[in-house]
UniProtKB/Swiss-Prot annotation:
Class of enzymatic activity (EC top level): transferase
Entry's family note: Belongs to the EPSP synthase family.
Residues that bind 3-phosphoshikimate: K21, S22, R26, S166, S167, Q168, S194, D310, K337
Function: Catalyzes the transfer of the enolpyruvyl moiety of phosphoenolpyruvate (PEP) to the 5-hydroxyl of shikimate-3-phosphate (S3P) to produce enolpyruvyl shikimate-3-phosphate and inorganic phosphate.
Keyword Transcription regulation: no
Quaternary state and interactors: Monomer.
Protein name, entry field: 3-phosphoshikimate 1-carboxyvinyltransferase
Keywords: Amino-acid biosynthesis, Aromatic amino acid biosynthesis, Cytoplasm, Transferase
This protein's encoding gene: aroA
UniProt xrefs under NCBIfam families: aroA
Annotated source species: Methanoregula boonei (strain DSM 21154 / JCM 14090 / 6A8)
Amino acid sequence: MIVTLPARSGIELSVTTPPSKSYTHRALIAAALAQGRSTIVRPLMADDTKLTIASLMKLGVAIHADQHNIMLEGCDGSFPNTPGTVLDLDNSGTSLRLLASAALLATYPVTLTGSARMQERPLGPLAHTLNDLGGMVIFTKKEGYPPVTIGGRLLGGTATIDGSQSSQFASSVMMAAPYSKGPVDLTVTGTPASQSYLDITAGVMTDFGAVIRREGYRRFLVSNCNHYTGRTFVVEGDYSSASYFFALAAICGGKVTVAGLAPDSVQGDRLFLDALQRMGCEVTYAHDGVTVENQGPLTGITINMSSAPDTVQTLCMVAAVARTPTIITGIGHLKFKESDRIAVTADRLRMLGGIVTAERDRIVIQPATLHGGRIDPVNDHRTAMSFAVLGLGIGGITITGAECVNKSFPGFWEILSKVME
């Protein structure tokens, strides 16, 4: 699928954000492990979450899903899978990482694999921790990377995990921990990447009945005496998906309102709104949504986005049209996403005339006169959506492989077509 974006200005748009991918993944796994029946209301039905659903069904969980609800019969902490279970998670890092620890709760060993890019995404820190807690983790191709076969049992105890590459490693252990043989005392070393996602994990676990004591983002103690209980769980709206429409208002000028956002959400990508406000946009919060309005030039800022990784590329697009430089730090872990997002973003902006300096943990974007061009997002949904928004600001940008947005936001192009008309 190829999409060419025309230049637009004076945007007036009201949309409802899709449900959160992060919450949907975690609610699915908690419900699958719970005792009793759960209904997940307003889940995100996208490629990644469908992979999690399919994998849980392969592990023996009874699931019925439609576009509005997902019903699960929990397995009470023991997946009744069959010998030789293989879970192909394609390029869904969240699915593979969260399910890796849960695989220790399966009757038979589980092999997790994925796309060529997935096999380049590190899993070593999680494997070391699972081995310390009673698992038997075997990498079948390259040490530290999928494919991986996971057996053994989650015995519990004290362990450490390196959180500098991804907070999903710690989230994975935490989500399985209520069903360990003993309590789990997990210490996160390094500077935790995307630490706000640990708040999401802990929140979902608590909602399903787990008991967690924590010391900030450094230590999590999970009881094995309080298991998950089936319940009805309503998935909140996604701030990262909403960011593309907020960026439209900033880049094209105009006013965009996004409904379906919890004002008290712990999602780290809320930081994107603070960034827009600092750059010159007017941001208004209401009970069930947020409005962003911009009628003038944007000013560059310096900001640490370590807690809001999924909106870094969107912010880069806004920075590219600002009248002063922008410095974004705390982004080193983006190298391990669906693509090396730091390198890809810098390269594609330069193709459009941007002046960009990319380093290990930061990116600097200077004011420049931009022009159109052809953008290959290398099958990365967030790259495609970010450059689409920039395309509506400057015109003449063509996105190839545009269907990759289905990974997290199947309705993206349909909504954007309202602006393109």
